[in-house]
């Protein structure tokens, strides 16, 4: 059930950030996306009733259990380091543009 919900969230939103409200790395990614003017869906796993199930589904699907877990245009980007690295390499804005998020 959680896997279906997770894949549905990813396929129906240009950008999805699976996050936790208290996570500083999640905050960094959300601030970066805000600065770029990107529209994105945040799923705060610590406030969702099925958050731990979604986190387990993400781990099974992507091999990444940690947050943030970022998807752009249906593609798994990774966590904070991967997202900020894509930005410093000039790859993030084109991905966001292609996905229709900016």
From Swiss-Prot:
Disulfide cross-links: 23-26
SUPFAM superfamilies recorded: Thioredoxin-like
Gene3D superfamilies for this protein: Glutaredoxin
Pfam families in the record: Glutaredoxin
Top-level taxon of origin: Eukaryota
Keyword Metal-binding: no
UniProt keyword terms in alphabetical order: Cytoplasm, Disulfide bond, Electron transport, Redox-active center, Transport
GO cellular component: cytoplasm
PROSITE patterns xref list: GLUTAREDOXIN_1, GLUTAREDOXIN_2
UniProt domain Glutaredoxin: residue ranges: 3-102
Record's subcellular location: Cytoplasm
Main localization (coarse): cytoplasm
Keyword Transmembrane helix attributed: no
Summary of the function given for this chain in its UniProt record: Has a glutathione-disulfide oxidoreductase activity in the presence of NADPH and glutathione reductase. Reduces low molecular weight disulfides and proteins.
Protein family (similarity comment): Belongs to the glutaredoxin family. CPYC subfamily.
Listed NCBIfam families: GRX_euk (TIGR02180)
The protein's name: Glutaredoxin
Organism: Ricinus communis (Castor bean)
